Amino acid sequence: MSQSLRIVFAGTPDFAARHLAALLSSEHEVIAVYTNPDRPAGRGKKLAAPPVKQLALEHNIPVYQPESFKSDEAKQELADLNADLMVVVAYGMLLPQAVLDTPKLGCINVHGSILPRWRGAAPIQRSIWAGDAETGVTIMQMDIGLDTGDMLKIATLPIEATDTSASMYEKLAELGPEALIDCLADIAAGKAVPVKQDDELANYAKKLNKEEARINWNDDAAHIERCVRAFNPWPMSHFEAAENSIKVWQSRVAEQTSDKPAGTIVQADKTGIYVATGNGVLVLEQLQVPGKKAMSVQDILNSRAAWFEVGTLLV
């Protein structure tokens, strides 16, 4: 097979569009793009095209937006493209075995973690949430399971102490395309070596929800601090003060300890709002009150000191 592959790309959000952009700058030929149907977005709820569709149209690439691949028509449409390979990145749709078998070389997926550590929908967030030292991307040959296919390439990077899901997303959006292009070179040259996953090492990275992001002050301070970073930019760690929901944008673990009940404010000054937890003290450094942008603790205390007096019990 020649070094240039005929590729069908399947993806939807900005993360996927960055991988498509890398493909468009490579020696490979993107013959078609699959993406989710246009969805209502914004306050006006007008139909909005996914980022992948926008990029494909800019390059005059045919775009397909089936609701599913259940129909024979959708499957035949893909078969008629005569692709060597399908590259799938955050597509948001399950692919049946018939689709996985259609391209000559099958389908590969770029997954936002080091497999098999985190399979599922929220691997970036869960890696921070769990306190992992590193994360990365895994490119795998897709099978019918959930992120269970043989691994073709892994690229890693450290998780820094200040990384949030937002910052890690940006890093992986740069790492992923590089790894993909390297992997495609191996596939085109017949040098790709599939490695089976060890199922015993697998965890499921379940989706996040707003209820999970509510701070439980009985948890360890270190765990709460990781949650603050993992749940940024969504759903945002939060708690209640003076019957208002307060979002936490930045925090750190204090060196000091406290014997006060979990959730008690033990210190409040320009260095932060210090809150006793189940183990250790958490320092709140940047907060967002309803109707306002995120603010430093000093600005918060200048305007709402009564909400955060020492001895106040946060819930």
Swiss-Prot record:
Q: What is its EC number?
A: 2.1.2.9
Keyword Protein biosynthesis assigned: yes
User: Which residues are involved in binding (6S)-5,6,7,8-tetrahydrofolate?
Assistant: S113, I114, L115, P116
Q: Which Pfam families match?
A: Formyl_trans_C (PF02911), Formyl_trans_N (PF00551)
Any Gene Ontology CC annotation: cytosol
Instruction: Name the SUPFAM superfamilies on file.
Output: FMT C-terminal domain-like, Formyltransferase
The cross-references to InterPro entries, in alphabetical order and at most eight, read: Fmt, Formyl_trans_C, Formyl_trans_C_sf, Formyl_transf_N, Formyl_transf_N_sf, Formyl_transferase-like_C_sf, GART_AS, Met-tRNA-FMT_C
| Top-rank taxon | Bacteria
Print the keywords alphabetically. Answer: Protein biosynthesis, Transferase
Q: Which GO terms describe its molecular function?
A: methionyl-tRNA formyltransferase activity
Q: Which reaction does it catalyse?
A: L-methionyl-tRNA(fMet) + (6R)-10-formyltetrahydrofolate = N-formyl-L-methionyl-tRNA(fMet) + (6S)-5,6,7,8-tetrahydrofolate + H(+)
Matching entries from PANTHER family are given as: METHIONYL-TRNA FORMYLTRANSFERASE, METHIONYL-TRNA FORMYLTRANSFERASE, MITOCHONDRIAL
NCBIfam families (UniProt xref)? fmt (TIGR00460)
The text of the family note is:
Belongs to the Fmt family.
Q: Its function? A: Attaches a formyl group to the free amino group of methionyl-tRNA(fMet). The formyl group appears to play a dual role in the initiator identity of N-formylmethionyl-tRNA by promoting its recognition by IF2 and preventing the misappropriation of this tRNA by the elongation apparatus.
Task: State the protein's name.
Answer: Methionyl-tRNA formyltransferase
Q: Which organism is it from?
A: Vibrio parahaemolyticus serotype O3:K6 (strain RIMD 2210633)
